[in-house]
Amino acid sequence: MNDNIFCDNIDQIDLNTLQQLQGWQARYKQIVVWGKLLTAKPELRRDNYRVRGCETAAWLTHRKTLGGHEFALDADSKIIRGLAALLLKKIQHKTSAELKQLNIDALLIELDLKSHLSPSRSNGFLALAKQALALALDQH
């Protein structure tokens, strides 16, 4: 697989910005904007990379590096792409020990997303997160 799929520029994502925005519509728009930071990855769109439990089509792969873990994500839905970008911000280049400490439910609450996301979007985000963590932490 091409190394370029692991090179999304998520440096612009600042979770504090999201927390400071007033109102769900402003947050939703910001999440969609951040989703545009993820480049399209046609080579990732294969069944073996498909995220199970996500209502919209989403794909995920992983590789372990000397410094931690790298993930590549893609999705058809704008909001799921944005949520994937948020997830990447939290997990990209983290060590296994750091990933083990990550509490996805707490992240949804911290960003005030849990009460605003529909059940299907919330489930999609959780499916992405669980599959990412499983890929990283099941490495031998």
Regions found by a protein language model. Give the residues of each.
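Short beta-strand scaffold segments in enzyme catalytic cores
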Residues: 59-61
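Primarily the active-site beta-strand->alpha-helix module of PP2C/PPM metal-dependent phosphatases
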Residues: 84
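Glycine-rich phosphate/pyrophosphate-binding loops
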Residues: 94-109
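Generic structural signal for well-ordered secondary structure
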Residues: 51-53, 80-81, 100
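N-terminal intrinsically disordered, cationic/polar leader segments
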Residues: 4-55, 64-67, 72, 108-140
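Conserved interaction-surface patches within small, structured recognition/assembly domains
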Residues: 63-79, 88-92
